[in-house]
Amino acid sequence: MSGHHEAKPYQPRRGPAPADEEAAPAAAADEAEAEAEVEAMERYEQEQEYEEGEEGEEEEYEGGEGVPMDADASAAAVAGMDPHGEMVPVAGGEAGGGYPHVASNTLTLSFQGEVYVFESVSAERVQAVLLLLGGRELAPGSGSVPSSSAAYSKKMNFPHRMASLMRFREKRKERNFDKKIRYTVRKEVALRMQRNRGQFTSSKSKAEEATSVITSSEGSPNWGAVEGRPPSAAECHHCGISAASTPMMRRGPDGPRTLCNACGLMWANKGTMREVTKGPPVPLQIVPAATNDVQNGIVEATGVEQHNSAVEEAVSAANGHESQSGVA
C-alpha cells in the first residue's frame, strides 16, 4: 500500500529551445520586405508627382493659343536647337555621343553650345512635347508608349467635347416635351364665336335659320333642327299619326320626339303604351264639281275641304288628342 502513496519527484515541462540561427534569417527577410515597400512607396510618389506636373503643363497649354506646326518646320526647329540635328533622350553612355553616363529617365538637350540635362523625364512627356511642336513622334526604339499619343489626343479634344456638350445642353433647355395648352389661341376662337346667354350659338342669323328648315321625305318640316334639338319623326311610332296633326312630339322608347302627344304622355306617366282605338272607316263621298257663276264671277267652294277637315277632327277625337291637348 505504501508503494501506491509514494510521490514522484516534480519534473517541470520545458519547451523547445529557441532556434537562434533560424530567427536571424527571418528578421533579415522582414527588413528586406520593409525596405522594398519603402522603395515602392517612394517610386509611386515620384510617379504621382510626374503625372501632376504633366497635367498642370497641359492645362496651361490649353488656356493659351497653340499654333500648330507641320512636320518639316518642327524638324527644322529641333535641328536648329541641337548641333547633332535631333533631340536625344540618353539611356546610358552611348559610343561617340560625348555625353556622360546618366540614368534612363534623363533628358539631355544642347542649345547654342550649352548642354541642358533634365532629370526624371518620361518618354510619354517627351512625346507630348514633340507633338506640341508639330506632330513629330519618337522612334520606335526610343521607348515611346503607343497609347500615350491616343491619351493625349483625347485630352486635346476635351475642350471641343465640352463646347459641344454645352451647346447640346442649351438646345435641350429650349425643348419642351410636355403638351403646351395655348390659351391665347383658344381665347381668340372663343371671342370670335357668337353667344346667346353665355352659350355658343350658330354663326347664322335667326332669319337664315328660319329659312333653312329641312323638310323630310314625307314633307313634314323638321322643326327640331331650328331649335337645336334632334330631328323629330314624321309620324308617331306607335299610332302612326302625322307630326303635323299632334301638338308636339314627345319622347318614347325609340328616342326623343318619336311619339305623338297622347302616346308620349301615356309613356311618360305610366311607362306603357296606350291602346289605339280603331274607329270604323269613314266612307268617301263623291261630290260633284263646283258650278261657276259666270255672271257674278264667283266660284262656289265645294264641300270636299269641309269634309276632309271633319274627317281629321274625327280621327283626332278618336285618338284622344283633343282631351290631352289641354294637359300639354
Curated annotation (Swiss-Prot):
PROSITE patterns documented for this protein: CCT, GATA_ZN_FINGER_1, GATA_ZN_FINGER_2, TIFY
SUPFAM superfamilies cross-referenced by the UniProt entry: Glucocorticoid receptor-like (DNA-binding domain)
Ranges of compositional bias, category Low complexity: 14-29
Region (Disordered): 1-68, 198-231
SMART domains, per the entry: TIFY, ZnF_GATA
CDD domains recorded: ZnF_GATA (cd00202)
GO biological process assignments: regulation of DNA-templated transcription
Entry annotated with the keyword Cytoplasm: no
Function: Transcriptional activator that specifically binds 5'-GATA-3' or 5'-GAT-3' motifs within gene promoters.
Protein name: GATA transcription factor 17
